[in-house]
């Protein structure tokens, strides 16, 4: 093997049509070429190519060499044919730069090949610098062709490629060509998805490092048991990207469809030993993905499949692909990932989970809520209320004398306003979950919430006309009744969250029974396991998690009118407060839902993380665990550890909202529970899940091997 191998920088123009060069026409075939070529003889596209190279520090050295040789007149004519002419120059490379490694230098010749266009100017076709160890690639668009001639077509697009050919000591006489893109975004096809994680890579103390934590974790995994090839990231400006391998949103829909549990075998309401198939249509894709991140392929049972593919193979196909402007680097890492099925499953699950938990702004629902609440609320607060009361009690009536009647009148509008507003709020939650909804499904829930709001708002309305003599006592009573009114206005949310929780539990139970999800293990409390999985999933699910947090936010913001009123600080007049109640207080749930969706995109280091930052930490943990434990069985991430990354304990609004939702659901369930104790009614779905059945495998639903 030759220890001194030629390493070249190339600037090339790819063939225009079918890979075949065009025959010379016009001046190209007629004119003789000068012995020396100067800058004035170059076309505008050639100058633009050199200027584009100069814009990057890594490219500047080579562009300078070409321009200097042109200015000095050292490019001398060598040969020509029907399509191009060749010029060469002998150059002296500076000794204080690592642009060329002198120990690998073969010669110091700079070769330029050019083509004469129909304007008698030269377009650069290629340039070769022998002896360089650098490798870059560059695209430069040329100006539109003039006169439509064939020679002008050649200058429509000038493609500048600088590539290197490096020797590999491990492979006799083999050579690797690395094309480095000056800008990943510049060369990305329009249809190619943007990278999820992107970082620069450099060599440091013999290893490859990156300032991006996720990319650094990927590099650590790749070089955990094998060093990178010496030619990988051997120049500055190397970037590494993790980008989706396939259409992740489409893949998520396939995953959701495959793992939606339509029916579950539950206990009969009349006989607990009897099992009945009940429609649940339970969506369990988020807890499944969480479990796949925690345990890899071990999360699934023998019957977990998506079409003709196993769940393991499907998730592995969703793992991100690694791209780089250094082909040696990306090829090495992709080969490492390809040989690690467990890691691909976990990374694929994380890719899907990232999309599954993405919170989208719901403009339609917000506009509907503000329109209904603000318009109807303002019409009542600023006009209709006073007109109606004056018509009934006279213009100079005493509010304290008719406190109960006036409070009753004020409690009627919430029945209408909150019913319509709850429709919008539930539509927002359904939209965030990506679920279809119909008016017939939401209307009963909305009317129930409107009725609750109307009843619960009555005590607060009474205190607006007949308060306590004690200022402190009056403020305390108003605080309690105001919070009750807020909860009543949002009474459509807690039952929606509870319904999702019960259906998910039933779905997880059935998936374990059917061998889709792996059994928790012998001696493990399956009920507690399923309850924990459900809680962890709903804490990050886009619809339910945002709904719960919105309850916490509404309970705080909803107190502003009371605090600013003359019952407390007196900061705002009653007229202003009426407008505030109409514009903000009434549609507070819809505003909170969308504000929280947008807030998930904000990242403030040290205070709170964006959703993207949380998922990046999960990817980093998956890769770090793989680096520490090359065996798949030792890489498990605990459920609590993963939950802490995605739903930190510091999420104040989640804790407040959860307490409110659980408390409201308990109060809603109090009377039905009492009725059931008297022997009437059917037990709720959550109480009819036969967790004890999971102790015995259900072989009747499992296919024969």
From Swiss-Prot:
The alphabetized UniProt keywords are:
Hypersensitive response elicitation, Secreted, Virulence
A single Gene Ontology CC annotation of this entry is: extracellular region
Give any single GO term for biological process: symbiont-mediated perturbation of host programmed cell death
Question: This protein's superkingdom?
Answer: Bacteria
- Main localization is secreted
Compositional bias ranges of the Polar residues kind: 1-15
| Chain residue ranges for the region called Disordered | 1-40, 175-205
Where in or outside the cell is it found? Secreted
Q: What are the disulfide bonds?
A: none
Function of the molecule: Effector protein involved in non-host recognition.
Q: What is this protein called?
A: Effector protein AvrPphDPsv
UniProt source species: Pseudomonas savastanoi (Pseudomonas syringae pv. savastanoi)
Q: Corresponding gene?
A: avrPphDPsv
